[in-house]
């Protein structure tokens, strides 16, 4: 039997490793400095539109900073044991936020565990968009005696739970129901307009208190979600190394720590070793060790890696693609980030052999590596320049790189990825093409046979 994975930490302090049989644990030294730094409003958000700098306090910091959730728990049927972990922060009342689909699938398992132990639980239904209008509506539905906010679901639900918790000065517990991104662990939320356009980032002084993952739920999700998470996580090491080389400020607000860098590298190594097996496990709905390892890589390692390392071109390219219309928006976050990672590799002038190795691994993971697979085979030069200009907005993470670019260079790199990838496909006889799904939320990806 695969035991639960546990990780306990206090944010922004030096790493101390602890061994524990059948579990993975790390602890961070505590200090009164957190209270002194942030004052009484421990959970007050810092709202900013700058993704690569965390508030004014951090811009000039050259200290090594490592930030993380207080605890990470991952295991099969973990939601049925919710009270065991929630009671550290709340024993009387909780708000559980999930969309209707997640309520139908698994969120009630958490409610049942809490209710059976005497807690009063308020169930809120997330409307689907992490906009200020929706967040204000949800905030008003939270009882005054709420002790903890629990977000169950995808990225926007998790971001909403973080925002509400911090606005109420309450601890937050984040329960991803897919391993499709590394958003769960971070101390930020992405805020959108009511019609789904990016509006701003909200940064918080502390990460979520608990990341709580039931892998029996994760493994029942369509394999496309796991693959998207792999695409997102593959960017972590590439972007972190770029940020370190340029000595830029990490999302944590200072210089990347050795721990952050090694976690990003461990994320890459774990994916290279286990991703293909995990994808096959997911197609059969079985929680193998490989599957558990990739869930941890997609969620914990990638989350700690990007926040303590930083973002660079890969995510900026993803954001830049919002400048054009069309089928590309049927792709999930990690699917677009994967292509953005290849663009960054071209911008950094990696050897063609290294590009081919990365592109081939992505293709084997059923990620898009050509413009046709992105759904934009006939994209025009002007549209690519629009992507380039959006990628280079002043607040974008591409400015964490040591080299500076112009829109034409971005457009050329996007086309170069398409050219190199097509050439690799021709030379190797690779015929398994990524098939653009009918919608962003469609579970269908391609025919993946175990």
Curated annotation (Swiss-Prot):
Cofactor descriptive note: Binds 1 zinc ion per subunit.
Q: In which pathway does it act?
A: Polyol metabolism; glycerol fermentation; glycerone phosphate from glycerol (oxidative route): step 1/2
Q: Kindly state one GO CC term assigned in the UniProt record.
A: mitochondrion
Family annotation (Pfam families) = Fe-ADH (PF00465)
Does this UniProt record's set of keywords contain S-adenosyl-L-methionine? Answer: no
Give the UniProt subcellular location, in the record's own words.
Mitochondrion
Q: Which cofactor does it need?
A: Zn(2+)
GO terms of biological process kind: aerobic glycerol catabolic process; glycolytic process from glycerol
- Residues annotated as binding Zn(2+) are 232, 315, 333
Which EC number(s) are documented for this chain? 1.1.1.6
Q: What switches on its expression?
A: Repressed by glucose.
Please describe what this protein does: Glycerol dehydrogenase involved in the assimilation of glycerol.
Please report which protein family the annotation says this sequence is part of.
Belongs to the iron-containing alcohol dehydrogenase family.
State what protein this is by name: Glycerol dehydrogenase 1
What's the source species for this entry? Answer: Schizosaccharomyces pombe (strain 972 / ATCC 24843)
Phylogenetic lineage: Eukaryota, Fungi, Dikarya, Ascomycota, Taphrinomycotina
């Amino acid at each position: 039997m695969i035991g639960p994975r546990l990780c306990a930490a206090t944010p922004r302090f030096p790493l101390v490793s602890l061994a524990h049989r059948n579990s993975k644990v790390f602890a961070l030294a505590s200090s009164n400095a957190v209270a002194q730094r942030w004052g009484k409003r421990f959970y007050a958000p810092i709202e900013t539109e700058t993704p690569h700098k965390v508030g004014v306090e951090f811009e000039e910091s050259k200290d090594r900073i490592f930030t993380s959730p207080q605890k990470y728990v991952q295991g099969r049927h973990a939601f049925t044991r919710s009270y065991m972990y929630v009671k550290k922060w709340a024993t009387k009342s909780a708000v559980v936020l999930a969309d209707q689909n997640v309520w139908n699938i698994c969120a009630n398992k958490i409610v049942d565990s809490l209710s059976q132990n005497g807690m009063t639980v308020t169930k809120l239904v997330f409307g689907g968009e992490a906009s200020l209008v929706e967040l204000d509506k949800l905030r008003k539905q939270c009882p005054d005696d709420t002790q903890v906010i629990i977000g169950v679901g995808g990225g926007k639900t998790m971001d909403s739970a973080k925002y509400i918790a911090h606005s109420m000065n309450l601890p937050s517990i984040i329960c991803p129901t897919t391993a499709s991104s590394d958003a769960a662990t971070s101390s930020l939320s992405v805020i959108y307009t009511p019609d789904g356009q990016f509006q701003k980032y909200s940064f918080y002084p502390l990460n979520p208190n608990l990341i709580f993952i039931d892998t029996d739920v994760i493994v029942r999700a369509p394999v496309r979600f796991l693959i998207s998470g792999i695409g997102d996580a593959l960017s972590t090491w590439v972007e972190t190394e770029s940020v370190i080389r340029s000595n830029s400020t990490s999302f944590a607000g200072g210089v990347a720590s050795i721990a952050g860098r090694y976690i990003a590298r461990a994320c890459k190594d774990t994916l290279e070793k286990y991703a293909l097996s995990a994808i096959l496990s997911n197609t059969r709905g079985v929680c193998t060790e490989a599957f558990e390892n990739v869930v941890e890589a997609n969620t914990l390692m990638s989350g700690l890696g990007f926040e303590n390392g930083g973002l660079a071109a890969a995510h900026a390219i993803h954001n830049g693609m919002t400048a054009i219309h069309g089928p590309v928006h049927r792709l999930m976050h990690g699917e677009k980030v994967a292509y953005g990672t290849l663009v960054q590799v071209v911008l950094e002038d990696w050897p063609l052999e290294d590009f081919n190795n990365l592109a081939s691994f992505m293709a084997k993971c059923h990620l898009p590596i050509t413009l046709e697979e992105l759904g934009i085979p006939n994209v025009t030069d002007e549209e690519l320049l629009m992507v380039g200009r959006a990628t280079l907005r002043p607040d974008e993470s591409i400015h964490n790189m040591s080299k500076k670019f112009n829109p034409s260079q971005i457009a050329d790199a996007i086309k170069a990825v398409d050219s190199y990838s097509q050439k690799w496909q021709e030379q190797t006889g690779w015929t398994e093409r990524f098939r653009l799904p009918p919608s962003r939320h469609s579970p269908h990806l391609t025919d993946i046979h175990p």
